[in-house]
C-alpha cells in the first residue's frame, strides 16, 4: 500500500518575517545540520587536534540560545540530511535551523544537482512546517581557498556555483534564507582558514557567525565572544598538517585519487556534451 505524499502547507509568516520575530525570543532553540564545517572542524583554539564550537556554536553563544544541538557529521553529503539528520530537527522543533552542505558532494564523481536540490527542499519544507527559520550558508569559491591543482579547483568552483544557485532558488521559493560567502573578500582571506585550507579557522568560524547574525539582523546578546586567538607556531601547524594529512591520505587514497581523476575526466565530458 503506497503512502500518500503529504502536501507542503505554506506558513502564514515568511522566513524574513520570522527572522525579525526571533529578535524578541528569549528562550531560543537552535539546531545545526550539515558536514564537518558545521561540526566545528578547524575551530581548534589553542589545541589543533580538537574540534571547537564552530560557527553554529558561536552563533548560539552570541545569541545566548537556551538550547543548542549540533547533528552535523564529518563527510556528510546532501543525501544524508533527510535520512540521518532531519529526524532530530523534527523532534527538537527549533526556532532556527542552520545548514551548510555541499562540499563533499562537489568532490564526488556522482555529483547530482537534482539530488542535492531534492534533499535540501525536503529538509527546508519539513523545518518550515514546524515553524523553524531555515538559514543556509552559501559556499565560498574553491579557486581562492582550496588546495590542489588549478584544474581541479576550477571544476569544484563550477560545481559550487551550481549549489549556490540551488540555495538561491530555494530561498526564492520561500524555503529559507541564504547567507552568501562567494563575494566576500574577507571570507577568502588566508587567516580565515584552517591550515588544511578546507575548513574555517577559529577566526573564520567567528566571522561566519557574525555574518549570519548580521544578515538576519539579530543583535548579539552575549557580553563576551568566544576567543579566536591561536597560540600555535607555524612550524607546529605544518607538522600537524603533514602528520594528520598523511594519515588521512593513507586512509582515503584508495578511493579518493581515482575519484578525483574521474571527476576531472567526467566533468570535461559533461561540458563537451552540453556544448554540442
Give a label for each model feature.
Residues 2-74, 84-93:
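Serine-esterase "nucleophile elbow" of acetyl-processing enzymes
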Residues 2-16, 173, 196-276:
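Conserved catalytic region of serine esterases and O-acyltransferases that act on ester linkages
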Residues 43-48, 80, 108-113, 154-155:
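Short, solvent-exposed loop/turn segments at secondary-structure boundaries
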Residues 72, 76, 101-103:
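Cell-envelope and extracellular/periplasmic
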Residues 89, 93-98, 103:
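Proline-aspartate-enriched helix->loop->beta-strand connector
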Residues 113-121:
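Charged helix-capping and loop-helix junction motifs
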Residues 129-134, 176:
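A short helix->loop->beta-strand "cap" motif at the edges of active sites that frequently abuts
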Residues 144-181, 202:
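Substrate-gating cap/lid alpha-helix
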